[in-house]
């Protein structure tokens, strides 16, 4: 994602503002548009790590993410001349719907430029909110360039997804809500892409209680902000590789970089495996649908938890399609040792399949799928057949036990996954 650059003087101008007052103003702007999301205590994570873990479910918002806060605050602060000309944004995700919804509420014309790769579901959702959607280019950068071109041509106000002071002040209202409900919170875990969400929350929280730790979380394949802070200057990643597309940003914003560098206490990294497991836990334990970027803070709890600590995780959004959910659930089940697939060679004689089935049943392995192929063998002249079995298991220790029992009965097991 390219970033609309701010001049150095602009960054310093915004850094010197009264952040608390501007975020309180944003709260006032938003009061008739959205309700504060509640803090939900996670009994699962609290028991798992012997601390108090709370979730802040921004996936409960209209349009399914926190983005409405910043977009609406930006539009609410526009002058009448700007509003009359309309607004424009570029996005393939939550920002598009946040801007479209906010513009509809304020009665302002909105144009959203989306790349060709945008799922039809998101295109239609954005159109349903009254926005004029333009499909352009093969990647986000192409859509961004087109949006800037149209902004200059027609005088539209560009609503940046993160590197805008009014936008991040809107996101900062989340921080106010947390402190109103849990004033003795120790740490707040926040996903980082371009940095708008964490910047806003950091400004809000640190202006009221500087002792609260603000912790950023990034996927291992999208570490632009972490690398930039560590190197002391804005860095651009050559490539991105993460399932958490909502935080897949090659370069942080100029303003968000300065705020993060000054106010964020630490940035931790999580793996793709961590993220997939967190999606599964969100569904199974929290009974809550959250997108991959949304659960990134949950994936980092084990890295920050300690006895008695009060931790809040920002669940930034819940816009995820059912096909993706299905795939991630399966990967999460495999990762947590809930499913195992293995192959075993059997002598091609009666009773061998039954013996395997009995051993699995005796060890509480529920067979999900079984393929018994007499024409499939490692050595075609060995007079053996290959059996492939997928079983439901109860964790990695259960898998180890099953493999051990089969091997004790002279079966050679090859793990597939």
Sequence positions of predicted segments:
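PLP-dependent amino-acid enzyme catalytic core
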Residues: 3-417
């Amino acid at each position: 994602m390219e970033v609309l650059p701010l001049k150095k003087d602009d960054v310093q101008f915004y850094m010197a503002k009264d952040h608390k007052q501007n975020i309180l103003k944003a709260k006032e702007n938003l009061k008739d548009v959205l309700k504060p999301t509640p803090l939900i205590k996670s009994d699962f994570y609290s028991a798992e790590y012997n601390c108090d873990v709370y979730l802040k479910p921004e996936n409960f918002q209209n349009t399914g993410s926190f983005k409405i806060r910043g977009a609406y605050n930006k539009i609410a602060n526009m002058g009448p001349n700007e509003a009359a000309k309309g607004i424009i944004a570029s996005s393939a995700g939550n920002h598009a719907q946040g801007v479209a919804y906010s513009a509809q509420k304020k009665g302002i014309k909105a144009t959203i430029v989306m790349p060709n790769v945008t799922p039809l579901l998101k295109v239609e959702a954005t159109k349903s909110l009254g926005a004029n959607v333009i499909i352009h280019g093969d990647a986000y950068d192409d859509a961004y360039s087109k949006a800037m071109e149209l902004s200059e041509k027609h005088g539209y106000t560009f609503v940046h997804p993160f590197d805008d002071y009014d936008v991040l002040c809107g996101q900062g209202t989340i921080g106010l809500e947390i402190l109103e409900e849990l004033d003795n919170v120790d740490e707040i875990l926040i996903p980082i892409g371009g940095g708008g969400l964490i910047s806003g929350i950091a400004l809000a929280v640190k202006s009221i209680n500087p002792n609260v730790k603000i912790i950023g979380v990034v996927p291992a394949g999208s570490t632009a902000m972490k690398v930039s802070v560590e190197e002391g200057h804005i860095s651009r990643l050559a490539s991105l590789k993460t399932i958490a597309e909502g935080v897949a940003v090659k370069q942080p914003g100029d303003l968000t970089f300065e705020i993060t560098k000054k106010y964020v206490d630490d940035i931790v990294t999580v793996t793709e495996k961590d993220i997939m497991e967190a999606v599964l836990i969100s569904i199974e334990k929290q009974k809550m649908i959250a997108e991959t970027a949304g659960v990134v803070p949950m994936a980092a709890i084990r890295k920050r938890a300690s006895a008695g600590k009060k931790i809040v995780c920002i669940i930034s959004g819940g816009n995820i399609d059912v096909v993706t959910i299905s795939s991630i659930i399966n990967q999460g089940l495999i990762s947590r040792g809930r499913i195992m697939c293995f192959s075993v060679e059997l002598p091609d004689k009666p009773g061998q399949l039954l013996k395997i089935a009995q051993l699995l049943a005796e060890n509480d392995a529920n067979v999900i799928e079984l393929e018994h192929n007499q024409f499939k063998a490692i050595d075609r002249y060995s007079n053996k057949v290959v059996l492939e079995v997928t079983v439901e298991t109860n964790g990695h220790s259960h898998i180890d036990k099953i493999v051990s029992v089969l091997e004790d009965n002279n079966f050679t097991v090859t793990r597939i996954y």
